[in-house]
From Swiss-Prot:
CDD domains: PRAI. Its EC number is 5.3.1.24. It comes from the Bacteria. This is N-(5'-phosphoribosyl)anthranilate isomerase. Pathway: Amino-acid biosynthesis; L-tryptophan biosynthesis; L-tryptophan from chorismate: step 3/5. The keyword Secreted does not apply. It catalyses: N-(5-phospho-beta-D-ribosyl)anthranilate = 1-(2-carboxyphenylamino)-1-deoxy-D-ribulose 5-phosphate. It comes from Streptococcus mutans serotype c (strain ATCC 700610 / UA159). Belongs to the TrpF family. GO terms for biological process: L-tryptophan biosynthetic process.
Length: 193
């Protein structure tokens, strides 16, 4: 069954809703954005998350030191990296890497040393989908996440199209820029039923 990552969580209520509804991954955004949390906030929220639900730190062009500190402090089970990053440094930390790839026009470079790939819209967190016809995943040899404009209304179609390891949502479970408990529940139900 397709796994679910709920990203950009910053409140106890949203974390509780995601966990109780069956999320497999919880994403904490450390990159500068409206969803950014501090290490201290993430550490506090992480204490509410059972071991079976994996905690993912989301970064844009991080340094190795930033990753190591976050992995240890929160603690994180995986890191997700957007932007510039030397994947050879992955051997220097102890958790799996999710490498984000923005899908734009034309062929994207799908080769990566990361443990997972995450395919997203050109502007992550924008609520926009990418053109699903631009991405060919049949030849991929590693598990991948699909993100970008997913909602409870289109996630089943996405799963049928790609058969991904996991789907990732942030703005698709928000109302007026805030996580919406009912939308979180509906999204997870749409994937898991």
């Amino acid at each position: 069954m397709t796994k679910v990552k709920i990203c950009g969580l910053s409140t106890q209520e949203a974390v509780t809703a995601a966990v109780s509804s069956g999320a497999d991954y919880i994403g904490f955004v450390f990159a500068k954005s409206k969803r950014q949390v501090s290490l201290e906030q993430a550490q506090k929220l992480a204490k509410m998350i059972p071991e079976k639900v994996k905690k993912v730190g989301v970064f844009v062009s991080p340094t190795l030191e930033e990753l190591k500190i976050a992995i240890k402090t929160v603690p994180l089970d995986l890191v997700q990296v957007h932007g510039d990053y030397d994947e050879d440094l992955q051997t220097d930390f102890s958790v799996p890497l999710i490498r984000a790839v923005q899908i734009k026009k034309g062929k994207e470079n799908l080769t990566s040393k990361a443990d997972y790939l995450l395919f997203d819209a050109p502007i992550a967190g924008s609520g926009e989908t990418f053109d699903w016809q631009q991405l060919e995943t049949e030849q991929l040899q590693k598990p991948f996440f699909i993100a970008g404009g997913l909602t409870s209304d289109n996630v089943k179609e996405c799963i049928e199209h790609f058969a991904p390891y996991a789907v990732d949502v942030s703005s698709g479970v928000e109302t007026n820029g805030r996580k919406d408990i009912e939308k979180i529940k509906r999204f997870i139900e749409s994937v898991k039923k």
